[in-house]
C-alpha cells in the first residue's frame, strides 16, 4: 500500500440471497500508511439501493482504517487473489490486493 493511492471503501447490507439491498461506495486517497492501519482522505460517495443510484455527494473527511485480516478471495473482482482487509466501523471496509 502506498501513499496517494486511490481506494474504494464499501459498506452495505444484503438480503438472504447475498444481493446487496443497500450499498455505499466511497472514493478516497491514502494519506498515511502504518504497519497495522491506513489513513484515508475521502472525497466522493455514491449510495445505491437495489442496483439504482439513490444519492451521490462529495465529502471531505479523513478516517483511520485498522487492519482486520488477510483472506484468499473466492469470488468478486479479486477472485483467486490474496487481499488484506482494513475496516472502520463508520465507513466500511477496504480490500488491498497483494
Q: Residues of each region from the PLM?
A:
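Enrichment for repetitive, rod-forming helical segments
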Residues: 12, 39, 59-62
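Short coil-to-beta transition motif at edge beta-strands of beta-rich domains
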Residues: 1-21
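Basic/aromatic-rich interaction segments and small domains that mediate binding to polyanionic partners
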Residues: 24, 29-53
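Intrinsically disordered, low-complexity, charged/polar segments
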Residues: 45-98
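Glycine-centered tight beta-turn/hairpin loop motif at sheet-sheet or coil-to-beta transitions
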Residues: 21-23, 91
Amino acid at each position: 500500500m502506498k501513499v496517494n493511492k486511490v481506494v474504494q471503501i464499501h459498506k452495505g447490507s444484503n438480503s438472504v440471497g447475498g444481493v446487496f439491498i443497500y450499498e455505499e461506495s466511497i472514493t478516497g486517497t491514502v494519506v498515511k500508511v502504518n504497519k497495522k492501519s491506513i489513513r484515508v482522505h475521502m472525497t466522493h460517495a455514491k449510495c445505491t439501493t437495489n442496483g439504482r443510484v439513490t444519492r451521490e455527494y462529495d465529502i471531505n473527511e479523513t478516517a483511520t482504517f485498522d487492519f482486520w485480516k488477510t483472506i484468499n478471495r473466492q469470488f468478486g473482482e479479486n477472485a483467486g487473489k490474496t487481499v488484506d482487509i482494513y475496516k472502520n466501523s463508520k465507513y466500511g471496509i477496504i480490500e488491498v490486493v497483494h
